A protein has these predicted regions:
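Positively charged, amphipathic and often flexible ligand-engagement surfaces
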Residues: 1-182
Length: 182
């Protein structure tokens, strides 16, 4: 706790605003992510979603990360498109919240497990292909250690190119080492 206490803050507190102001004054932008792993129930998922939406309403918050597994409980592995539709319904309000400001707040779609890779990419590309989000710059995280990451990167690069050709905003692809190198 001592080692990371300077990195963990209450998402609604004055300490967060002080840290965000300090970072901005030093030329930094902080990526905020509510703590917690995959949610176990719908009440927890809706709570996480609402807390993220409220966080994005803070004018000092310019960058936030969210995982599909944190906003929708018990995704059905046999109904990928159904999962994606449910997730898009849940995430649209967050992306709309991000677009209310100028410049827009940045939302980074994160994922941690291999089982979420293809769903997350499909969710990200479908959501950002919707007309209302064409001008929203957003990002996605790829775990470098996953066997399908290179192909996923190529898919996302093609999507980004086609999106720009249609007049859309750019996307950011963040490649990370990954925490699960076991």
């Amino acid at each position: 706790r001592q080692m990371v206490s300077h990195l963990v803050l209450d998402a609604e507190g004055k300490a967060l605003n002080a840290k965000l102001t300090e970072a901005k004054e030093q030329g930094y932008q902080l990526n905020l992510n509510l703590l917690g792993e995959a949610v176990l129930g719908e009440a927890e998922a809706k709570s996480r979603l609402e807390r993220t939406r409220q966080m994005l309403q803070n004018p000092l918050v310019t960058y936030a990360s969210i995982k599909a597994s944190s906003v929708c409980a018990q995704l059905n592995p046999w109904d990928i498109q159904g999962n994606i539709e449910r997730l898009k319904d849940r995430l649209r309000p967050l992306y709309r919240e991000a677009m209310k400001r100028s410049p827009h707040a940045f939302i980074n779609m994160d994922m941690e497990e291999y089982k979420d890779l293809h769903l997350t990419i499909k969710l990200f590309t479908e959501l950002l292909s919707e007309e209302e989000f064409l001008n929203l710059e957003a990002g996605i995280v790829l775990q470098a250690y996953l066997p399908d990451t290179f192909e996923a990167f190529r898919t996302l690069a093609t999507f980004a190119k086609e999106r720009r050709e249609k007049g859309g905003a750019q996307i950011k692809i963040r490649l990370v080492k990954g925490a699960n190198l076991s």
